[in-house]
Amino acid sequence: VKTPITEAIAAADTQG
């Protein structure tokens, strides 16, 4: 299960 924190990091990392 992904945590909201992990989701935020992944989203920011995708944006570069």
Curated annotation (Swiss-Prot):
Record's comment on post-translational modification: Contains one covalently linked bilin chromophore.
Membrane topology of the entry: Peripheral membrane protein
Keyword list, A-Z: Antenna complex, Bile pigment, Chromophore, Electron transport, Membrane, Photosynthesis, Phycobilisome, Thylakoid, Transport
Listed transmembrane segments: none
Gene Ontology cellular-component terms listed: phycobilisome; plasma membrane-derived thylakoid membrane
GO term, biological process aspect, one: photosynthesis
Primary localization: membrane
Location(s), subcellular: Cellular thylakoid membrane
Superkingdom field: Bacteria
Family per record: Belongs to the phycobiliprotein family.
Subunit structure: Heterodimer of an alpha and a beta subunit, which further assembles into trimers and the trimers into hexamers.
Purpose of the protein: Light-harvesting photosynthetic bile pigment-protein from the phycobiliprotein complex (phycobilisome, PBS). Phycocyanin is the major phycobiliprotein in the PBS rod.
Name assigned to this protein: C-phycocyanin alpha subunit
Organism per entry: Tolypothrix scytonemoides
